[in-house]
């Protein structure tokens, strides 16, 4: 499945991290699997949705909001400009077990 709608874009930031970015036309989910020991097929971008979708099941990753606000290392994210959108209708971020 391709990432996002035509008005969205994806950016591969490192071999283990792909960010599906947001713009003013569409909201895209974000999945950062760099801290999980998963195979390459899990590194595909997530697709557009009202809320960031979970990582691939049955091996979920740590939710992005937890990764970006934790002390865990996130390689390749130092030079990325991230725009955060809060969506009250979304479920609260609860860290998953990797």
Swiss-Prot record:
Sequence repeats lie at residues 3-7, 8-12, 47-51. GO terms for molecular function: structural molecule activity. The keyword Repeat applies. Residues 3-59 are annotated as: 3 X 5 AA repeats of C-C-X(3). The keyword Repeat applies. Pfam families: Keratin_matx. In the hair cortex, hair keratin intermediate filaments are embedded in an interfilamentous matrix, consisting of hair keratin-associated proteins (KRTAP), which are essential for the formation of a rigid and resistant hair shaft through their extensive disulfide bond cross-linking with abundant cysteine residues of hair keratins. The matrix proteins include the high-sulfur and high-glycine-tyrosine keratins. This is Keratin-associated protein 3-3. It comes from Bos taurus (Bovine). The gene is KRTAP3-3.
